[in-house]
């Protein structure tokens, strides 16, 4: 027993160590960001204050309000001394206008310097990359992020969904559920909401809150539509496969269903065993009298095998649904990589590293779901390799689009409004309907603790990746 639990302990310790190091890195990064923000706020406040004092002193230096009024309005009139106080008030409003002009100029300078920094930070901007080099970089990066996780999958000591690997597989499934939920709520949905939030912040006035609710509401509806679509697909597949299963053993399934509602479940099972034994005796007597073997010996037991076969088919549906969601997700990753390489070689490399860090834990979770669905290790890896087609298609789409418009919108979170939230809905459905129920099986307290830690490890990984992005 101790030898069997060695691998789960090792995986749990590795996940906890990885999460702890990530939290330390995130804490240091957050401290630096806070220091930069405080320094920027102090610099901006001091500069604005000195400028405002200088302008206020300038308004007092004029002495007479009518001269400043004539400069502001462009005409000259005679004013008495009693009106000069009103003119000073106008001079104060002029100072406010000048301050707003300073803010606009400062924002323009900041934007210009930021753009210059981006060009200098990316050593190879898109004008320096010809078409062949651009395609080579983008497709090579896509192949890298698709093939790199397989080196990690080779190290996982899980060959199939067997009792010998059940404890480790349950921990990997919990890690997969945490990764799927974290990816949906911390990566896909926030990226889909980012352009809408920026749009509402840029609009002045108090009427933007109503106009900004439409796009945000559409993102939520697309998430729900993804959940409903995956539910409809799974029910349809189960209906097709279920009708085939009931044709083999309808009587056994019906009696077993009725027996599960009563409190005497053991009595029902013993009666079924007795009836099956009687049927076996009758069939053997018929075979002896006829001198042939028209009925197989395992005939009465076949409905039970058909029921198990139906359950296996139902489990494979969840694996295929997860592959469909992963295919759409890889398509968006390919769009982001293609658009980033159009913006520059440095930006493309940075985006590739970010997507790679995101894909490794995600592919480990997908592997666990496929193995739990009934696939062997080789079959699961082959099916995951097919999802790389989605990433290559996304990269090609971003490179073929004029100016990389579609790819840049997807990379920034805008894109077609249904891609990211619909994929998030699929991830939420797979995690909550297909994966989490498998973790509710009876287990030892230590195994349950490791499963909870695995789920938290998957969420923490997505938190760290979102922080790096």
UniProtKB/Swiss-Prot annotation:
Q: What is this protein called?
A: Zinc transporter SLC39A7
Signal sequence, renumbered to the chain: none
User: What is the recorded function of this protein according to its Swiss-Prot or TrEMBL entry?
Assistant: Transports Zn(2+) from the endoplasmic reticulum (ER)/Golgi apparatus to the cytosol, playing an essential role in the regulation of cytosolic zinc levels. Acts as a gatekeeper of zinc release from intracellular stores, requiring post-translational activation by phosphorylation, resulting in activation of multiple downstream pathways leading to cell growth and proliferation. Has an essential role in B cell development and is required for proper B cell receptor signaling.
The scientific name of the source species is Homo sapiens
GO terms for biological process, alphabetical: B cell differentiation; intracellular zinc ion homeostasis; regulation of ferroptosis; skin epidermis development; zinc ion transmembrane transport
Membrane topology, as annotated: Multi-pass membrane protein
User: What gene, per UniProt, encodes this protein?
Assistant: SLC39A7
Q: What are the inducing conditions?
A: Down-regulated by Zn(+2).
- Assembly mode: Homodimer.
Where in or outside the cell it occurs: the entry states: Endoplasmic reticulum membrane; Golgi apparatus, cis-Golgi network membrane
Q: How is its activity regulated?
A: Phosphorylation activates zinc transport activity.
Q: What clinical condition does the entry mention? A: Agammaglobulinemia 9, autosomal recessive: A form of agammaglobulinemia, a primary immunodeficiency characterized by profoundly low or absent serum antibodies and low or absent circulating B-cells due to an early block of B-cell development. Affected individuals develop severe infections in the first years of life.
Cysteine pairings via disulfide bonds: none
Tissue expression profile of the protein: Widely expressed.
Bias (Basic residues) ranges: 242-263
Q: Molecular function (GO) terms listed?
A: zinc ion transmembrane transporter activity
Compositional bias of kind Basic and acidic residues:
42-56, 66-114, 264-285
Pros-methylhistidine modification, residue list: 66
A cellular-component GO term for this protein: nucleoplasm
Q: What is the lineage of its organism?
A: Eukaryota, Metazoa, Chordata, Craniata, Vertebrata
Q: Which family does it belong to?
A: Belongs to the ZIP transporter (TC 2.A.5) family. KE4/Catsup subfamily.
Where are the Phosphoserine modifications?
275-276
Q: How is it modified after translation?
A: Rapidly phosphorylated by CK2 following Zn(2+) treatment. This phosphorylation is required for efficient cytosolic Zn(2+) release. Methylation at some His residue by METTL9 leads to reduced zinc-binding.
Name the InterPro entries for this protein: ZIP
Which of UniProt's keywords are assigned here?
A: Disease variant, Endoplasmic reticulum, Golgi apparatus, Ion transport, Membrane, Methylation, Phosphoprotein, Transmembrane, Transmembrane helix, Transport, Zinc, Zinc transport
Where is the stretch described as Disordered? 42-121, 242-310
Membrane spanning stretches: 10-30, 138-158, 169-189, 214-234, 381-401, 417-436
| UniProt main location, coarse | endoplasmic reticulum
């Amino acid at each position: 027993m101790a030898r069997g639990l060695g691998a789960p302990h090792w995986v749990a310790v590795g996940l906890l160590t990885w999460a702890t190091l990530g939290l330390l890195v995130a804490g240091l990064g957050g401290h630096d960001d806070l220091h930069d923000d405080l320094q920027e706020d102090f610099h901006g406040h001091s500069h604005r204050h000195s400028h405002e004092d200088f302008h206020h002193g300038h308004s007092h230096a004029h002495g007479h309000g009518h001269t400043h009024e004539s400069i502001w309005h462009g005409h000259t009139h005679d004013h008495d001394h009693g009106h000069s106080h009103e003119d000073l008030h106008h001079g104060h409003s002029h100072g406010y206008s000048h301050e707003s002009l300073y803010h606009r100029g400062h924002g323009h300078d900041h934007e210009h310097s930021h753009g210059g920094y981006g060009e200098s930070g990316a050593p190879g901007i898109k004008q320096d990359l010809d078409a062949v080099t651009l395609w080579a970089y983008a497709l090579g990066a896509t192949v890298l992020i698709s093939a790199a996780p397989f080196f990690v999958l080779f190290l996982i000591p899980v060959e199939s969904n067997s009792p010998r690997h059940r404890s480790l597989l349950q921990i990997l499934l919990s890690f997969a559920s945490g990764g799927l939920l974290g990816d949906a709520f911390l990566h896909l949905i926030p990226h889909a909401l980012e352009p809408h939030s920026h749009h509402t912040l840029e609009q002045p006035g108090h009427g933007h809150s109503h106009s900004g609710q439409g796009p945000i509401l559409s993102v939520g509806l697309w998430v729900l539509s993804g959940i409903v679509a995956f539910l409809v697909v799974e029910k349809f597949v189960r209906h097709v496969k279920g009708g085939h299963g009931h044709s083999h053993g309808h009587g056994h399934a019906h009696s077993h269903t009725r027996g599960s509602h009563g409190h005497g479940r053991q009595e029902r099972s013993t009666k079924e065993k007795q009836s099956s034994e009687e049927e076996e005796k009758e069939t053997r007597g018929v075979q002896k009298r006829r001198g042939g073997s028209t009925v197989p010996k395992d005939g009465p037991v076949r409905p039970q095998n058909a029921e198990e076969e139906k359950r296996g088919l139902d489990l494979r549906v969840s694996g295929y649904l997860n592959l469909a969601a992963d295919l759409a997700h890889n398509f968006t990753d390919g769009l982001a990589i293609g658009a980033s390489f159009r913006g520059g070689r440095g930006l493309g490399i940075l985006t590739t590293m970010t997507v790679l860090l995101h894909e490794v834990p995600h592919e480990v979770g997908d592997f666990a779901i496929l193995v739990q669905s009934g696939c062997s290790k080789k079959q699961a890896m082959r099916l995951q390799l097919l999802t790389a087609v989605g990433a290559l298609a996304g990269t090609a789409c971003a490179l073929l689009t004029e100016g990389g418009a579609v790819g840049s919108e997807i990379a920034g979170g805008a894109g077609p409004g249904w891609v990211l939230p619909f994929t998030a809905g699929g991830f939420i459905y797979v995690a909550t309907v297909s994966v989490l129920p498998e973790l509710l099986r009876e287990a030892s307290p230590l195994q349950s603790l490791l499963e909870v830690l695995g789920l938290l490890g998957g969420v923490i990984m997505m938190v760290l990746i979102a922080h790096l992005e």
